């Protein structure tokens, strides 16, 4: 039985990105923006984009979105070119904030440009 997800689109979570290889974002505990809707998240996997204070390549290439929070004190940019499907429960993620609606909308538009 799949555990109900408490994570919703727009949530900022603290989650481990290890293991990672190559150019993938890594880190034992880093913030990420939830992009998938709660109905999908209830299936056990969640689409997230890492948040960084670096990300120069992504900034110049148009793959990042400046982060503005409605809740929480997280700063940086959302790296849309580094999205990843994750089991947030298995990775013991916790909610640490909420992104502004315009941040989520812009991230989804940039993600759409990546996959089209």
UniProtKB/Swiss-Prot annotation:
InterPro entries: PemK-like (IPR003477), Plasmid_toxin/cell-grow_inhib (IPR011067). Disruption phenotype: No visible phenotype. Belongs to the PemK/MazF family. Its EC number is 3.1.-.-. The keyword Nuclease applies. Homodimer, interacts with ChpS, which inhibits the endoribonuclease activity. Stimulated in vitro in a concentration-dependent fashion by extracellular death factor (EDF, a quorum sensing pentapeptide sequence NNWNN, probably produced from the zwf gene product glucose-6-phosphate 1-dehydrogenase), which is able to overcome inhibition by cognate antitoxin ChpS. It is an enzyme of class 3 (hydrolase). It comes from Escherichia coli (strain K12). The keyword DNA-binding applies. It holds the Pfam family PemK_toxin. One of its GO terms (biological process) is regulation of growth. Induction: Part of the chpS-chpB operon. This is Endoribonuclease toxin ChpB. One of its GO terms (cellular component) is toxin-antitoxin complex. Keywords: DNA-binding, Endonuclease, Hydrolase, Nuclease, RNA-binding, Toxin-antitoxin system.
